[in-house]
Regions:
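Conserved, structured core segments of small domains
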Residues: 1-104
């Protein structure tokens, strides 16, 4: 099977701190539904910056900064799309960028 990088963008944090557990439970259930296909559940990420080819730095991560990542195994890009469809981030208004990770 191939490896796919899921890069999460956007999404809204829970409106109330009490809702955090429900959000984390939803992520746990989604990862659980994929079983061994989850190679690395990843992490949320903090503020980012971009290094340009001239060496200059731009804060803010560009037009669509990443909010987290995971590494998933799937049989094809279509299978990766199906796996991504259950992600709780999508219900929170976020998006998922999917790219095949090439073995070197």
């Amino acid at each position: 099977m191939a490896k796919y990088l899921f890069v999460y963008h956007g999404g809204k944090p829970p409106a109330h701190p009490a809702d955090t557990k429900a959000v984390m439970d939803a992520w746990g259930a989604w990862f659980g539904s994929m079983g061994a296909a989850v190679i690395d559940g990843g992490n949320p990420v903090g503020p980012s910056s971009t290094v340009r080819s001239d060496g200059s730095l731009v804060d803010g991560g560009g037009a669509n900064p990443a909010s987290g990542y995971s590494l998933i195994e799937a049989t094809s890009l279509a299978d990766a799309h199906k796996k991504a469809a259950g992600c709780p981030l999508l219900k929170a208004g976020g998006t998922i960028e999917i790219a095949q990770a090439m073995d070197m």
